[in-house]
């Protein structure tokens, strides 16, 4: 008889490879109108991730699948900023994210002791929760950047895992080889990733390799213990159109592809992050390249923004790029608000950014033929044909805003709106088919 013990199954990918369908896989399958085996197969080979920390599962989180054949997920960024620290305002943003259909919240708090806010968020929200431990490191350890050690950084990662964070953006791909490429080839906007810039600065001052790259296996051990999904951060994403698809971005993407395989081998789930700023005609090719280089891992993108001059309207520039990126293979969109490049977003900015991104994600899902993606659109068509406003609100992504605008401008003719009144085309054709009088209010 063999004395070897079976390896302990901890992560979703562990269970999937053992042929077991977890409750989270079943939940994802039901929500996505897929067979549970469809989900299990793709979790097993890394094409789908279910970011669900074992700690957060015990607190009642909902399971969300990210990846091939699933609906495009949407993330909301928030968190306490040093220049405008207001926890109450951030909780308003959490409520908006939950009420208006976000799938994930990333706590990007970077001021002081952030653990209380993070722990409360994980305790209270059923959505996926992500963080960037590098943002937290300086406040957590109470040290200047260049004094941080590898042990310090990994202590912060472990603290986030213990708290129940479902996915962490960790900039593992920016190693000495990538920074050499960056310094040799140059860029218009240099490095615009906050976490990536901090690591680049640390590497340049200390002369050391990126500890998240050098000690990647140790990082994987922490993530495996809690089933934290690694979201491989793209330190070298383009910060302007000029830098898109350059040698530095591609060099890092190649490194991220290698790290995907190492993570999967260790039983750790992976997502890969992407651009950024990118011209409209380059997006589809970039998505396909990423999927190839990173072995079809779920792709998590920030837009991309399709122009650099939409200041104050970057939720629109990002939604345009997001619709194209998601319809071309991206699986997860990070929202962008009107405040992008300007200031910390307020609650209204969060709502505007979330809705713009949800529209982009939904449009992409229709194009990708995601099961039942168009159902609500068809119901909306039926409701509008009947001029059934109550049904219209039930179909709308944001019924609150739609109903508010409609009621602020009451029409004189029942069933119509003030744009057309009695000249409403839908009303006119309905009357034709009903055989009733077409009264336009202009008759003698």
Where are these regions (language model features)?
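Basic/polar N-terminal segments that are highly enriched at the extreme N-terminus
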Residues: 1-10, 442-444
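Alpha/beta enzyme core
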Residues: 3, 11-15, 20-309, 313, ...
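Hydrophobic alpha-helical segments with strong N-terminal bias
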Residues: 3-6, 313, 349, 405
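Catalytic or ion-coupling anion/metal-binding cores of large enzyme and transporter domains
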Residues: 180-204, 238, 242-244, 344-444
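C-terminal catalytic subdomain
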Residues: 309-318, 324-370
């Amino acid at each position: 008889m063999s004395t070897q013990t079976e390896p302990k199954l901890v992560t979703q990918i562990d269970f999937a490879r053992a042929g077991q369908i977890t409750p989270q896989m079943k939940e994802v399958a039901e929500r996505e109108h897929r067979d549970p085996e469809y989900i299990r197969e793709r979790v097993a080979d890394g094409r789908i991730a279910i970011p669900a920390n074992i700690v957060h599962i015990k607190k009642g989180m909902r399971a969300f699948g990210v990846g091939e054949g699933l609906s495009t997920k949407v993330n909301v960024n928030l968190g306490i900023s040093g220049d405008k620290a207001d926890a109450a305002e951030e909780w308003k943003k959490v409520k908006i994210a939950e009420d208006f259909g976000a799938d994930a919240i990333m706590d990007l708090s970077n001021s002081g002791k952030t653990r209380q806010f993070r722990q409360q968020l994980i305790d209270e929200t059923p959505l996926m929760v992500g963080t960037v431990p590098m943002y937290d490191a300086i406040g957590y350890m109470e040290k200047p950047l260049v004094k941080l050690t590898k042990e310090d950084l990994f202590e912060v990662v472990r603290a986030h895992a213990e708290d129940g964070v479902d996915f962490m953006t960790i900039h593992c791909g920016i190693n000495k080889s990538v920074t050499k490429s960056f310094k040799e080839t140059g860029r218009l906007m240099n490095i615009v990733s906050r976490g990536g810039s901090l690591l680049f600065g640390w590497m340049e001052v200390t002369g050391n390799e990126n500890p998240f790259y050098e000690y990647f296996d140790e990082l994987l051990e922490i993530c495996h213990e809690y089933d934290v999904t690694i979201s491989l951060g793209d330190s070298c994403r383009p910060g302007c159109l000029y830098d898109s698809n350059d040698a530095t971005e591609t060099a890092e993407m190649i490194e991220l592809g290698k790290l995907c395989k190492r993570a999967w081998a260790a039983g750790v789930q992976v997502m890969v992050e992407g651009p950024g700023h990118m011209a409209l005609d380059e997006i589809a090719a970039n998505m396909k390249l990423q999927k190839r280089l990173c072995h079809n891992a779920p792709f998590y993108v920030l837009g991309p923004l399709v122009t650099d001059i939409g200041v104050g309207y970057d939720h629109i520039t990002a939604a345009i790029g997001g619709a194209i990126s998601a319809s071309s293979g991206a699986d997860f969109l990070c929202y962008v608000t009107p405040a992008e490049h300007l200031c910390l977003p307020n609650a209204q900015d969060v709502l505007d950014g979330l809705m713009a991104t949800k529209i982009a994600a939904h449009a992409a899902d229709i194009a990708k033929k995601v099961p039942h993606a168009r159902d609500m659109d068809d119901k909306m068509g039926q409701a509008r044909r009947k001029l059934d406003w109550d049904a219209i609100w039930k179909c709308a992504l944001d019924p609150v805003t739609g109903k508010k605008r409609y009621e602020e401008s009451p029409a004189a003719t029942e069933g119509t709106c003030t744009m057309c009144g009695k000249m409403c085309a839908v009303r006119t054709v309905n009357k034709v088919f009903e055989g009733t009088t077409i009264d336009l209010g202009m008759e003698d």
